[in-house]
Curated annotation (Swiss-Prot):
GO molecular function term, any single one: transaminase activity
Name the record gives this protein: Glutamate-1-semialdehyde 2,1-aminomutase
Organism: Bordetella parapertussis (strain 12822 / ATCC BAA-587 / NCTC 13253)
Domain of life where this protein originates: Bacteria
One GO CC term, this protein: cytoplasm
Pathway info: Porphyrin-containing compound metabolism; protoporphyrin-IX biosynthesis; 5-aminolevulinate from L-glutamyl-tRNA(Glu): step 2/2
Membership in a protein family: Belongs to the class-III pyridoxal-phosphate-dependent aminotransferase family. HemL subfamily.
Primary enzyme class: isomerase
Catalytic activity: (S)-4-amino-5-oxopentanoate = 5-aminolevulinate
Record's subunit section: Homodimer.
HAMAP family: HemL_aminotrans_3
Keywords, ordered alphabetically: Cytoplasm, Isomerase, Porphyrin biosynthesis, Pyridoxal phosphate
Length: 427
């Protein structure tokens, strides 16, 4: 049996940095990444056979817990009939219909294979439909790794302390206006200066890639009003929050309806599925109907769609989100109470099945505030919890995720471990 360290050393010889997505490398927390061999329910097991309670959840998709038997069965049954056809299937139509039925802002939707594809194409669609070039995004919000969006981004870029990426020509981001999240006045000023040039505003309606930052009261409604007034397209990037925070995503919780929505993660049930959709008049600009090009060999892949359909059916059961939200809130509140009892500066927040942990005196409301949190304290907390069998994201700038299988016993075990760790942090 190989150890995690041996596997990481081997991986580094053939894969850049030893990983296929940078945050997995543990660079921001130090130490050796855990190589996962299997997962079931709320647990993962590493290459050395150690079991962990998992709050990474494949970075969001595992809302039902890992390897849910009905999802696994759906994948197996689909795979028997073929892995990929490069042609339309009834299943992809069914998934599209299901997404439209669940999200009132969707009139039409197209399936892709990732969140990056979804956001990249939504931006292209907004530009093509409006004939404008400039876009507004927000500092710390991550919308995938397409060139024009790698400006003051969150997720891996924030983890590594890089506000943008090498290899992106200045011309590619010349039309991107990065503004402060939750600062509606800055958006108003940008529209006052560039209104006739702005194609769209893209936003994580709850930011989950600079830890968890909720929208300020009136922020999303204000974006809706400004986009309507200036003829710009409002895009909600619900790749992370879609069907994770509630049955209709953030737009269902707030009542703010975007023009376009991007989705991924949960809708694939752990398989590579993304989607973008919205107003039919906008979607009519996508090929083969219009002149905005988009294509994909594996878009609507039948095996991935089978996982998505099974997941979407299960999360649609009555009471699902009430139970998920209650467990997530219990975890966040329990962690905050134990930190406070230990005298450790710490805050926690939650929405639906997502939570944020911050080593600071209050819950941050912006990129600047989350950047000021104590990352060294987080590193100590992360490793001490990992030693006790609790698997949090290896970055102070990533949200955490609870699944339907995180029952009271799992939450209690997590809080017991955290109580021990907070006592050591105080010392």
């Amino acid at each position: 049996m190989s150890t995690n360290a041996e596997l990481f050393d081997r991986a580094c010889r053939s894969i850049p940095g030893g990983v296929n997505s940078p945050v997995r490398a543990f660079r921001s927390v130090g130490g050796t990444p855990r190589f996962i061999q299997r997962a079931q329910g709320p647990y993962v097991w590493d290459a050395e056979g150690k079991q962990y309670i998992d709050y990474v959840g494949s970075w969001g998709p595992a809302i039902l817990g890992h390897a849910h038997p009905e999802v696994v069965r759906a994948v197996q049954e689909a795979a028997v009939h073929g892995l990929s056809f490069g042609a339309p299937t009834e299943a992809e139509v069914e998934l599209a219909e299901m997404l439209i039925a669940r999200l009132p802002s969707l009139e039409q939707v197209r399936l892709v294979s990732s969140g990056t594809e979804a956001t990249m194409t939504a931006i292209r669609l907004a530009r093509g439909a409006t004939g404008r070039h400039k876009i507004i995004k927000f500092e710390g919000c991550y919308h995938g790794h397409s060139d024009s969006l790698l400006v003051k981004a969150g997720s891996g870029l924030l983890t590594f302390g890089n506000p943008s990426s090498a290899g992106v020509p200045p011309e590619f981001v010349a039309h991107t206006l990065p503004l402060e999240f939750n600062n509606l006045a800055a958006v108003d000023a940008a529209f006052s200066q560039h209104g006739a040039e702005i194609a769209c505003v893209i936003v994580e309606p709850v930011a989950g890639n600079m830890n968890l930052i909720k929208p300020a009261e009136g922020f999303l409604a204000g974006l809706r009003e400004l986009c309507t007034r200036h003829g710009a397209v409002l895009i909600f990037d619900e790749v992370m929050t879609g069907f994770r925070v509630g049955p209709q995503g953030v737009q269902g919780l707030t009542g703010v309806r975007p023009d376009l929505t991007t989705l991924a993660k949960v809708i694939g049930g752990g398989m590579p599925v993304g989607a973008f959709g919205g107003r039919a008049d906008l979607m009519a600009h996508i090929t083969p109907l219009g002149g905005v090009y988009q294509a994909g060999t594996l878009s609507g892949n039948p095996v991935a769609v089978a996982a998505g359909l099974a997941t979407m059916r299960l999360i649609g059961e009555p009471g699902f989100y009430e139970r998920l939200s209650a467990q997530t809130a219990r975890l966040a509140q329990g962690l905050q109470e134990r930190a406070r009892a230990a005298g450790v500066p710490f805050s926690a927040d939650a929405i639906g099945g997502m939570f944020g942990l911050y080593f600071g005196d209050r819950v941050p409301a912006s990129f600047a505030e989350v950047s000021a949190c104590d990352t060294e304290a987080f590193k100590r907390f992360f490793h001490a919890m990992l030693e006790r069998g609790i698997h949090f994201a290896p970055s102070a700038f990533e949200a955490g995720f609870v699944s339907a299988t995180h029952d009271d016993a799992v939450i209690d075990a997590t809080l017991e471990a955290a109580e021990q760790v907070f006592a050591t942090l105080r010392a």
